[in-house]
Design a protein with these regions (language model features):
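N-terminal secretory signal peptides
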Residues: 1-3
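C-terminal segment of N-terminal export signals and the immediately downstream linker at the start
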Residues: 22-59, 79
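Metal- or metallocofactor-binding catalytic centers and their adjacent structured scaffolds
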Residues: 41-45, 50, 79, 84-157
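Glycine-rich, charged/polar anion/phosphate-binding loops
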Residues: 60-63, 162
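Short Gly/Pro-enriched turn/cap motifs at secondary-structure boundaries
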Residues: 64-69
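Metal-dependent enolase-superfamily TIM-barrel catalytic cores that perform enediolate-based chemistry
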Residues: 162-196
């Protein structure tokens, strides 16, 4: 059975059809020009930035116990060699026990910001995410945002979307689901049409 790192090496190799030894990319050795990695030729390091904001909803979101028009959110950016990957930590009030609050997410991301530069490159996904997970229990939204930003960054560096890296057919991807809040029948029909 392949571990995550070996799978990424194999998948990247297959997706890009390269005859270059993929181990060079992941071992931090000289990087083939095929990849969009360390193009500046300097000792690139990852940098994490994060920006809190209030996500304004298009419609009032109502469930049995409350209504809201906003959701606390944090945008996460991980930059490496001039390329930026994006992630997001969303904390709807009814999930804050599991996901964290704005304050806990910001404090957790500050911890990650202080240590992410110790990893030589974003291709060490398994090691980085294991380290991030051990920083503190909980804070699932912040951890997910870092995970998403790292995957976005690696996909950009490999110049391939993840469905190709994983060898998937995007047309066969299952539909996603989400909650349409309680409203009048007319508004629920309108929201449903918007989502179709």
């Amino acid at each position: 059975m392949q571990n995550r790192r070996d799978f990424l090496k194999t998948a990247a190799f297959a997706a890009l059809g390269s005859s270059v030894a993929i181990n060079n990319v992941f071992a931090g050795e000289s990087t083939p020009s095929l990849f969009n990695i360390n193009k500046s030729g300097v000792n690139a390091r990852m940098k994490l930035r994060f920006f809190p904001y209030e996500l304004k909803l298009r419609h009032v979101f109502t469930v049995a116990t409350y209504s809201r028009t906003t959701t606390p959110d944090v945008q996460v950016e991980i930059e490496y060699d001039g390329i930026t990957g994006y992630g997001e930590a969303s904390m709807p009030p009814y999930l804050q026990k599991e996901l964290g609050t704005m304050e806990s997410v910001m404090a957790f991301l500050k911890k990650v910001q202080d240590v992410i530069g110790q990893f030589p490159d974003p291709f060490q996904l398994e090691d980085i995410l294991a380290y991030v997970d051990k920083l503190s229990p909980g804070d699932a939204a912040a951890k997910a945002a870092v995970d998403i930003a790292l995957h976005d960054l690696v996909g950009k560096l490999l110049q391939a979307p993840w469905y190709k890296i994983w060898g998937l057919d995007k047309d066969k991807a299952p539909s996603t689901t989400f909650t349409i809040g309680i409203d009048t029948p007319e508004v629920v029909r309108e929201k449903t049409k918007e989502c179709a």
